[in-house]
UniProtKB/Swiss-Prot annotation:
Residues 1-22 form the signal peptide. Keywords: Bacterial flagellum, Periplasm, Signal. Belongs to the FlgI family. It is found in: Periplasm; Bacterial flagellum basal body. The keyword Signal applies. This is Flagellar P-ring protein. The basal body constitutes a major portion of the flagellar organelle and consists of four rings (L,P,S, and M) mounted on a central rod. GO terms for biological process: bacterial-type flagellum-dependent cell motility. It comes from Pseudothermotoga lettingae (strain ATCC BAA-301 / DSM 14385 / NBRC 107922 / TMO).
């Protein structure tokens, strides 16, 4: 049988390609997710719960709060499990809105399947309760292709869609001293300067200033002092050309190479096995001389019959020699 090698090359124009909205590359300072956590009990397990004393003692104390006296020793039935409970609360969430919840076993429970999380307060980093979680725990479906051991491994982690109710809004201020700050998701000095320039051009006045590679400070115009929401929505829709550093990403296991369409290379002569390629005066010397980029080099190597492993090895050597003008990320 003929062995076929599949070589995947993905060319991504990472440098100066098109425009994107500010809302796609940045967030307003102060408007961020917050992590919540708590410790709770999952009940209703069919003998797959914890076997330890801690869980039964906790359940006995919970019953005591409802004036029900139960000996903790009588609760060692493995029908409950002590769990950590997690949720992320997005910005602007108000009381009564719902959050997705994740639960994970703390003890020696075998499975949380079929269990029910008893009402559990969820705390923020400041120690205050911001949400309460409760509901049926889902551990996902059964995959006949996966071994029983692997199935059991992931049945001690569960999920409760919309399982928590927000009880307290997390306070924040994103307008300070009549100004707001936007933070780039990927810091870059060039992009930061372009964002400030684009905002100033859109509003026809100098209200934005790039503070550093990640933050741009914007003064709120007097016309919008009583309508901040409209002003922020206009800022979000401003389009800007994004600049990204040159990068080549290779995956040795799959033979995948991802690189920007304009990643440049310096002059060099390559001799690798039966392959010989020369880059001179910024051109790849082949049947048709083309500009010296990673894209043109890879195309030339493919035409010579290079395998994915050959090309990855050549790129790594070029990076070590300093002729590849990009960061090389090997996965």
């Amino acid at each position: 049988m003929r062995k076929v090698t599949i070589f995947i090359i993905i060319i991504v124009a990472l440098t100066g390609f098109g425009s994107v909205r500010i809302k796609d590359i940045a967030d307003f300072r102060g408007a961020r997710d917050n992590q919540l956590f708590g410790i709770g009990v999952v009940v209703g397990l069919n003998g797959t719960g914890d076997s330890g004393q801690v869980n039964s003692t906790l359940l006995a104390n919970m019953a005591k709060a409802f004036n029900v006296s139960i000996d903790s020793d009588s609760l060692k039935t493995k029908n409950s499990a002590l769990v950590m409970v997690f949720a992320d609360i997005p910005p602007f969430y108000k009381e009564g809105m719902r959050l997705d919840v994740s639960v994970a076993s703390i003890g020696d429970a075998k499975s949380l399947e079929g269990g029910f999380l008893v009402q559990t307060p969820l705390y923020g980093a400041d120690g205050n309760v911001y949400a309460v979680a409760q509901g049926n725990v889902s551990v996902g479906g059964f995959d006949v292709k996966v071994s029983a051991n692997l199935q059991n491994k992931y049945r001690i982690v569960g999920y409760i869609p919309n399982g928590a109710i927000v009880e307290k809004e997390i306070p924040f201020e994103f307008v300070q001293s009549n100004s707001v700050t936007i933070l780039l998701k990927k810091p870059d000095f060039t992009t930061s300067a372009r964002v400030a320039q684009a905002i100033n051009t859109t509003f026809e006045r100098k209200i934005a200033k790039a503070v550093d590679a990640s933050s741009i400070k914007i003064e709120v115009p007097s016309a919008f002092e009583d309508d901040i929401v409209t002003f922020l929505s206009l800022v979000e829709e401003v389009e800007v050309s994004v600049d990204q550093p040159a990068r080549v990403v290779v995956n040795e296991k799959t033979g995948t190479v991802v690189f920007g369409g304009n990643v440049k290379i310096l002059d060099f002569t390559l001799s690798y096995g039966v392959f010989n390629i020369t880059v001179k005066n910024g051109k790849v010397e082949s049947s048709e001389e083309v500009d010296a980029t990673v894209s043109s080099l890879v195309s030339a190597l493919k035409n010579l019959g290079a395998t994915p492993q050959d090309i990855i090895a050549i790129l790594q050597t070029m990076h070590s020699a300093g002729v590849l003008l990009a960061d090389l990320v090997v996965m």
